């Protein structure tokens, strides 16, 4: 439901939605907000069938926008979507963890939780 974005000059922050904190995609992702790069997309409202995992806000803008969510189609197909993805976002450990976990979730696999797997992906 993209209908615009805020200026890339505004600092943007993202955080896990507390009601989604136990979702498998957020396994190992910190709950503190972190700075993201690029511009914050305006996508509200999202479909009622989605599960919003993270929201973001641009400095000086009160409206929070979904930045990561999931949906499961009528046939059971899993979808993960994020509006994050500026090249600098890939330097953020929590973003990489979320992205990795989303791939495992969509493939109906459990993300490895051991330290070696974590380090190879996300540190």
Residue ranges of model-derived segments:
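Catalytic beta-strand/loop cores that center a nucleophilic Ser/Cys/Thr
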Residues: 2-76
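Extracellular ligand-binding/catalytic regions of CAZymes and related secreted enzymes
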Residues: 59-65, 72-123
């Amino acid at each position: 439901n993209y209908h615009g974005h805020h200026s890339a000059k505004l600092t943007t922050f993202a955080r896990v939605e507390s009601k989604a904190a136990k979702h498998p995609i957020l396994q190992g992702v910190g709950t503190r907000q972190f700075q993201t790069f690029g511009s914050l997309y305006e996508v509200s409202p999202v479909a009622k069938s989605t599960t919003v995992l993270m929201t973001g806000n641009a400095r000086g803008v009160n409206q929070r926008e979904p930045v990561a969510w999931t949906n499961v189609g009528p046939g059971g197909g899993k979808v993960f979507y994020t509006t994050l993805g500026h090249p600098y976002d890939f330097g953020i450990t929590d973003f990489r963890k979320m992205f990795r976990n989303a791939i495992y979730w969509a493939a109906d696999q459990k993300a490895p939780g051991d330290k070696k797997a974590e380090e190879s992906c996300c540190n």
